[in-house]
């Protein structure tokens, strides 16, 4: 069970006084709206103008940084590749792949950090430059933590090689010595440079003994009186036993050799070999791993974990992983000396040295401004089978919780939401539910973006979300009077009610303009026209016009009559249909049979009598309208004449 945290972080909103005014707020998936209200439970509300602002509080502002977006995009590819690592791989092959993935993550962090550093240098005097510098420091700390976790949890380095990894770790993250070396070696007489001994000492503190010996040779060349001492100290550095990667000696052999070497260093110190040169004597004390001597160079060590690794190098080179936390804690205490308290970074590194993965993740979650680091590190550690036993108090596992929190921040961005989809896909327990909740809240600002969102939903058989998104797009299209687009979206949503609404708008538009818009869409409805009766009518009515245009009068007449007698046509459209029948009634050839003409007469009488049919709404009394009355009279006359013609024609056919 995960314990609850203490007090939550307080976010101060400029211009808002929560002591005097009550706050109104509304949560969203990626942000919160906050405003002041005049409501007060104790006092009567005064009609005084309050704060006119609505504040938007975003929890993941880093997604809006252009440089960090590169980090998010590139790490997404690494994350997806990691999920595809075959479970069958075991042992060294699987471990090698996981280490390679970890290094890829770190290279992305470092590339992002270097780019941000360039921006910080370019704008060092501006507020933006200071913001970049702050971000560089954060990324540097992130890479420092990740690298240590890689050594301890992924490489799982044993005693011996462990120290080599830690030395590389310190050298990578304490790199001021390189610029110092360039300054000293670039001078006319390096051994006389004011920073010469600082450089030699720093090289020794980092275990770069070959380079330190080269610097001592320069001192020996320029100062013959100390040449012998430099040669002795150089020999001590050269003969120091270190377990190199290709070395086959055992830890026991290494410890014996190191013990002899250590005794030799101590003998030279006691014999006063370097007594006449304080710099060389101080370096010999460093080689002995003397705490006091190391702390004299506190400024050159710069931080406690550098002190820790140097201390281990010269006093416990075969330190076991299980003992690391003891040396780490004592090194931290000695380095701080009670003068200051540990920083959040110190606590995180200490938790790592204690092999407390969950505490590392928890401390990072509190200290960092976004979920990128903890989400990806936790996922990688989960693939190393290190987190299986840890569930959060609300039932989810830690990996999914952190990945989904990170994904929720991506969904708040106008383009990074597509990355968030993949993170949800790889969370088998709650990923689907989270994706369904977030996908409906993506602002559909353009049709191209809407199609991308729909494609995501359709690929995952998210039927309800597809329907919901299509409804939203259909409504937008109706508001913009784009009826064709609205009809297309309503068909895609399989929304019969909305398809009926849009079909009515098409028919109303036809009555006003006398022609249809979006003919290609209506002509190619196909089986989709069966979605609603009104849509069926729209498609069939358009088919009537097509048949009439192709002079297929008999087929057109049969279709027109079936539209009326089947009661699929809205009652308000009957007069239009009867009016459409007039040209067919006036043809030289008899189109409507006597029976069909009787049906048309019945429909006309039903319409003019105002008698509603089968629950059809909006039956209106058209007798008072002179224009409609004229239409009715013309229709009656045309129907009567057609009836007479059809009876004569049918009688003649029977007689023959």
From Swiss-Prot:
GO terms for cellular component: cytoplasm; kinetochore; nuclear membrane; nuclear pore outer ring; spindle. This is Nuclear pore complex protein Nup85. Component of the nuclear pore complex (NPC). Component of the NPC Nup107-160 subcomplex, consisting of at least NUP107, NUP98/Nup96, NUP160, NUP133, NUP85, NUP37, NUP43 and SEC13. Interacts with NUP160, NUP133 and SEC13. Interacts with NUP37, NUP107 and NUP43. Interacts with CCR2. The modification N6-acetyllysine is found at residue 92. The modification N-acetylmethionine is found at residue 1. Pfam families: Nucleopor_Nup85. Essential component of the nuclear pore complex (NPC) that seems to be required for NPC assembly and maintenance. As part of the NPC Nup107-160 subcomplex plays a role in RNA export and in tethering NUP96/Nup98 and NUP153 to the nucleus. The Nup107-160 complex seems to be required for spindle assembly during mitosis. NUP85 is required for membrane clustering of CCL2-activated CCR2. Seems to be involved in CCR2-mediated chemotaxis of monocytes and may link activated CCR2 to the phosphatidyl-inositol 3-kinase-Rac-lammellipodium protrusion cascade. Involved in nephrogenesis. GO terms for molecular function: structural constituent of nuclear pore. The gene is NUP85. Its main location: nucleus. It is found in: Nucleus, Nuclear pore complex; Chromosome, Centromere, Kinetochore; Cytoplasm, Cytoskeleton, Spindle; Cytoplasm.
């Amino acid at each position: 069970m995960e314990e609850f945290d203490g007090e939550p972080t307080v976010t101060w909103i400029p211009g808002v006084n929560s002591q005097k005014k009550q706050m109104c707020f509304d949560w969203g998936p990626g942000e919160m709206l906050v405003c002041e209200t005049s409501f007060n439970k104790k006092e009567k509300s005064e009609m005084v103008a309050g704060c006119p602002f609505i504040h938007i509080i975003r929890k993941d502002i880093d997604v809006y940084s252009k440089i960090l977006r590169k980090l998010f995009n590139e790490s997404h590819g690494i994350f997806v590749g990691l999920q595809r690592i075959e479970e069958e791989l075991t042992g060294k092959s699987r471990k090698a792949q996981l280490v390679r993935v970890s290094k890829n993550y770190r290279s992305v962090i470092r590339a992002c950090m270097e780019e941000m550093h360039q921006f910080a240098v370019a704008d060092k005097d501006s507020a933006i430059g200071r913001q970049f510098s702050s971000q560089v420091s954060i990324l540097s700390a992130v890479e420092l933590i990740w690298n240590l976790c890689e050594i301890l949890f992924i490489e799982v380095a044993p005693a011996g090689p462990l120290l080599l990894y830690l030395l590389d770790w310190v050298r990578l993250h304490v790199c001021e010595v390189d610029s110092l070396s360039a300054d000293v070696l670039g001078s006319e007489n390096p051994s006389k440079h004011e920073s010469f001994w600082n450089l030699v000492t720093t090289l020794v503190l980092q275990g770069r003994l070959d380079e330190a010996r080269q610097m001592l040779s320069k001192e020996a060349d320029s100062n013959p009186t100390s040449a012998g001492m430099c040669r002795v100290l150089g020999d001590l550095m050269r003969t120091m036993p270190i377990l190199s990667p290709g070395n086959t000696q055992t830890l026991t052999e290494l410890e014996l050799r190191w013990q002899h070497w250590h005794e030799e260093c101590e003998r030279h110190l006691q014999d006063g070999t370097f007594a006449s040169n304080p710099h060389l004597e101080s370096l010999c004390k460093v080689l002995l791993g003397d705490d006091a001597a190391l702390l004299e160079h506190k400024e050159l060590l710069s931080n406690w974990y550098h002190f820790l690794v140097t201390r281990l190098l010269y006093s416990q080179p075969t330190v076991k992983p299980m003992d690391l936390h003891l040396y780490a804690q004592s090194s931290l205490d000695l380095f701080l000396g009670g003068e200051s308290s540990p920083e959040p970074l110190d606590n995180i590194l200490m938790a790592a040295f204690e092999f407390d993965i969950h505490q590392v993740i928890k401390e990072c979650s509190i200290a960092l401004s976004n979920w990128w680091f903890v989400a990806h590190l936790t996922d990688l550690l989960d693939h190393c089978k290190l987190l299986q036993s840890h569930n959060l108090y609300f039932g989810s596992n830690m990996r999914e919780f952190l990945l989904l929190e990170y994904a929720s921040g991506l969904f708040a961005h106008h383009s990074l939401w597509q990355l968030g989809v993949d993170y949800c896909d790889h969370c088998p327990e709650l990923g689907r539910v989270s994706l369904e909740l977030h996908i409906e809240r993506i602002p559909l600002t353009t049709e191209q973006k809407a199609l991308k969102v729909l494609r995501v939903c359709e690929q995952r058989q998210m039927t309800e979300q597809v329907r919901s998104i299509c409804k939203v797009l259909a409504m937008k299209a109706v508001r913009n009077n784009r009826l064709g687009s609205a009809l297309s979206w309503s068909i895609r949503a399989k929304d019969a009610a909305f398809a009926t609404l849009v079909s009515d708008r098409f028919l109303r538009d036809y009555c006003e303009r006398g022609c249809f818009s979006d003919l290609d869409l209506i002509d190619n409805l196909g089986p989709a026209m069966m979605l609603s009766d009104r849509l069926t009518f729209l498609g069939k009515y358009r088919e009537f016009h097509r048949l009439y245009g192709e002079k297929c009068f008999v087929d057109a007449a049969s279709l027109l009559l079936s539209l009326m007698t089947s009661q699929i046509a809205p009652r308000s459209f009957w007069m239009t249909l009867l009016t459409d029948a007039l040209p067919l009634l006036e043809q030289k050839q008899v189109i409507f049979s006597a029976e069909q003409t009787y049906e048309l007469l019945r429909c006309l009488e039903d319409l003019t009598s105002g008698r509603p049919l089968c629950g059809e709404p909006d039956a209106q009394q058209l007798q008072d309208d002179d224009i409609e009355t004229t239409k009715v009279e013309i229709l009656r006359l045309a129907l009567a004449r057609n009836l007479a013609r059809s009876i004569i024609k049918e009688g003649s056919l029977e007689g023959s």
